[in-house]
């Protein structure tokens, strides 16, 4: 999800994977 939400990855790397799914 780094490409989808690069800002979210910096704030919540773990939640970033949840957003993708």
Swiss-Prot record:
GO terms for cellular component: chloroplast. Keywords: Chaperone, Chloroplast, Plastid. This is 20 kDa chaperonin, chloroplastic. Its main location: plastid. Seems to function only as a co-chaperone, along with cpn60, and in certain cases is essential for the discharge of biologically active proteins from cpn60. It comes from Pisum sativum (Garden pea). It comes from the Eukaryota. It is found in: Plastid, Chloroplast. The keyword Coiled coil does not apply. Forms stable complexes with CPN60 in the presence of ATP. Belongs to the GroES chaperonin family.
């Amino acid at each position: 999800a780094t490409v989808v939400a690069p800002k979210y990855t910096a704030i919540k790397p773990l939640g970033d994977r949840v957003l993708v799914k």
